[in-house]
């Protein structure tokens, strides 16, 4: 499989500011971001204006290679092309580096003392929880049962499906998402750092996690498809799924954009199988699979037609880094869901839930499959059905996370799986990752403990302007953008002596004030000593 990219030169500028509504939003369905008035109990910190968030930050020579991350705005679906396009901007968060000196020292009452890193904290769900506003559990877009109900592909197309590299997704989807567990982790996700903030520091879903849990490739091309007009979506359905123009138009009209219902795709798959149109049947099967897994959106019923583009030539589908696609879409959905006004979580729920099962065994009450085969994706190791997923509410999980210590985390969990899925150095690449018009920052420098190194204070995030071509070039030359190896951990989860104190200043290690007042829960609580 090639590490290179297709030669398409995209004249599209990517702005580092955040794509909340990204891939899965259905226009006109009320799923976009909305503004929310501050409550009377919220910390009295003025919310940054849109113009302030959009300011370009000068990148200094010291930070020219450092990535930066997203902060959202209400916008149209970037996957759907506007009527007239001159410059298409893909946004990612304007975060650290944009605060004034006064802002840096203002802080938030009782929790975040230095807001220079988590600049969107005032609009974050963690701020709402801290001030006593109980947020409802997120609605999940979990389609594991849809995948299982469709079943494995018919024998005539099984070879085509396996050849795309996507077949591991057929078997590893969980049936039931744990709303309480996932909501508790979303509360700790921050777009500025692309990581979860916990009492012992930061952790994130890495490229190695995507590779090990899903057995998807993390080496290959990043798909460079462009936003799609509805007319183009209709033509794509006609060409690739062999439907009539009238049927395609009726379906996109019903979905109010370049989308089709998952049920409609299942019906097309069955019809193409009956007619013996095997290539079209394989494309329909894969579109349904992608819509239920990697690209699950908050509509919970639709899939974007644009994903068919990667299935146009099935012999070339395997060249894409599908593990990157999973991570990009998951990060983007987490970025959106962690804002205080959000009520839904899209993305591949299996990836997030099984990542939690693997790294936090003391938090999640998971059920292991006794018949698990080590040759299968690691996500197949757990059984998550309505019977096995316990109805534990978010506050209980919040309490468990507030009590976590370094020793409670499984920092390097795939040792016994390396014979099946080897570690690739590309997992330590830092910078922007993209899939179509969606771009997110991948920041392994903040979580080097997950690679076996001692965590030190990372450089502050810096905002910058880059083009899609720049993302391609960096990814192609990934060896120039690998996080430097530091000191190897003697004890798993080790960090430098100044790291925890720094982290407690720039973050909110605890979600509730009661735990913040308990020094014995602090990861840097002093050891007892004999006083003479």
Q: Which stretches of residues belong to each language-model region?
A:
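Extended, charge-rich alpha-helical regions
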Residues: 1-89, 93, 101, 105-108, ...
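Long acidic/polar interaction regions in large eukaryotic complex-forming proteins
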Residues: 64, 75-100, 109, 113-130, ...
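Amphipathic alpha-helical protein-interaction segments enriched in hydrophobic
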Residues: 343-355, 430-432
